[in-house]
From Swiss-Prot:
It comes from Photorhabdus luminescens. GO terms for biological process: mRNA catabolic process; RNA processing. The gene is pnp. Mg(2+) binds at residues 486, 492. Belongs to the polyribonucleotide nucleotidyltransferase family. This is Polyribonucleotide nucleotidyltransferase. GO terms for cellular component: cytosol. It is an enzyme of class 2 (transferase). One of its GO terms (molecular function) is 3'-5'-RNA exonuclease activity. It catalyses: RNA(n+1) + phosphate = RNA(n) + a ribonucleoside 5'-diphosphate. It comes from the Bacteria. Keywords: Cytoplasm, Magnesium, Metal-binding, Nucleotidyltransferase, RNA-binding, Stress response, Transferase. The lineage of its organism: Bacteria, Pseudomonadati, Pseudomonadota, Gammaproteobacteria, Enterobacterales. InterPro entries: ExoRNase_PH_dom1, ExoRNase_PH_dom2, ExoRNase_PH_dom2_sf, KH_dom, KH_dom_type_1, KH_dom_type_1_sf, NA-bd_OB-fold, PNPase.
Amino acid sequence: MLNPIVRKFQYGQHTVTIETGMMARQATAAVMVNMDDTAVFVTVVGQKKVKAGQDFFPLTVNYQERTYAAGRIPGSFFRREGRPGEGETLVARLIDRPLRPLFPEGFLNEVRIVATVVSVNPQINPDIVAMIGASAALALSGIPFNGPIGAARVGYINDQYVLNPTSDELKNSRLDLVVSGTAGAVLMVESEADLLTEEQMLGAVVFGHDQQQVVIDNINALAAEAGKEKWDWVPEPVNQALHDRVAELAESRLGDAYRITEKQERYAQVDAIKDEVTAALLEQDETLEEAEIHEILGSLEKNVVRSRVLSGEPRIDGREKDMVRALDVRTGVLPRTHGSALFTRGETQALVTATLGTERDAQIIDELMGERTDRFLLHYNFPPYSVGETGMMGSPKRREIGHGRLAKRGVLAVMPKANEFPYTVRVVSEITESNGSSSMASVCGASLALMDAGVPIKAAVAGIAMGLVKEGDNFVVLSDILGDEDHLGDMDFKVAGSCEGISALQMDIKIEGITREIMQVALNQAKGARLHILSVMEQAITTPRDDISQFAPRIHTIKINPDKIKDVIGKGGSVIRALTEETGTTIEIEDDGTVKIAATDGEKAKHAISRIEEITAEIEVGRIYAGKVTRIVDFGAFVAIGGGKEGLVHISQIADKRVEKVADYLQVGQETSVKVLEIDRQGRVRLSIKEATAGTAVEEAPPAPQSAE
């Protein structure tokens, strides 16, 4: 009854199996992909009927990690998985981006892809496995799809490209690049790098695309053996008569509208033209569908913009193809933040802040691959007012999470190591205006805010978004694209880096036929734009501030004997808790004896350091200490001499004369000098008052007040 069909092949250093026909047989297609014990189960369901009024392609990708895959039970209150985490959202986007452009234009049937991680080898990241699974399931489904695609991760270790490096290998890699494409074209690139050159990055993209052909070949072979019959789907025929009528009414007017450089004014004019043309046509013929008219108007807009660019005319806002919009760069714009910057590029603007915290502010991330601590956080917020809209506001959406991660990748390569700068750093980018490439504005703003905060980044970084318009062999690469150029163009190509090299590269291509030559032109043109932006940023701030903000916590580091850690912490944390309350500081202790004291007030930090030094100081025999009586017993008194250490003053060591009753000479809380006579093998301390006060008479203590009966 169950007849699994399996393809098994070698993929770099790993063995991959793709199996179908065993599970989820009511789904349109389902596969289990296994790469060296990391297994992802992927299903595809496509609806045969289009919903009434549907005017966009409803593709949904869900990626979910099950903790049982790693042999664990969820730590949440209900002990089950909840909403997708940030990592799962990013992988879902990674799967979606190369697949979406491969569905034919006009295909509006709902498609849902669900990828579930069911087994995980900590050395093999499930993201590539999930991408392969989604491609295979679509190839088997019969749904109209111009795939399959492959997927590969590329590392760069010892000046060599490495295919699908393990988690341990990635720790030593200067590159983490994911590339996906069809047999003939690259469609998607996502990467972070340690300031590599344009040539090294391009080489990695080509290497990854070449290597993933084995995946595409095996998916094609599996589809030939087990694939379902192709859907009998043809696109709706173009209503040429309606197209001509719309063009007659709107084409020249849209051309004039797209010469308006100011975004909101242009949008208002375009919307007015669309409304007038739609109303006029519906008045002439009530049987026409409004959605069809809008679709034709959209294609006319696209043709107007693209034809001008290809013919060498100025762009929508009057710029040449390689020009960057006007820049305005300011730092220190907010009085109480630790670092701030306002970065404006044309009609795109980001208000970016940097906040410094201690190690306990770091984010602990519990992932399927294991727990890790993140000391650098970058959050991106895109409120609706940034584009003049009144939309919903709430928790970050997929787009905001993805843009924030891209901006973080752009800055990560220049961040200082923990031993150089022991702070947790949080950067927040508030997009206050948007007309193209707000994520790259966030990179520029983050670099400026970090320098304003006194974070010793290795170099300033900037980001730029490139676009492409291509018809046949004719192509034009555009620098610093507008939102419209992104929407109407064939490629969105974002590059971030310093003067030395690239720190992040993201590429989304909507068409096939992007050659190595085109990517080379785009990278070189992006380098020129990046260097221009960096030169303008340098006029605002050249190097990181010499000192951190007066409002930021200052972290002072001292080293103690690891054997003394227990003394500083105390029983149940009593000593360290009392210390933090007494000094108003934050104290963190590492296993090697490193103690970090954070305080906004230098005097408080000094007080905390002196108290810790007292606690951890070695008691020296023969030395005199200031002490305080803590307990009185028949045979003497216990005296605290600092650092939580206590010693016994025997009754014979209180005074030069015979002492009959200890309470006649000492009271609890009384301060007195004591001399250390001996420390025995068990660490017990023997003290003497009479030797510490030799030559000074020890007076009897005043009688304790009698309680009234």
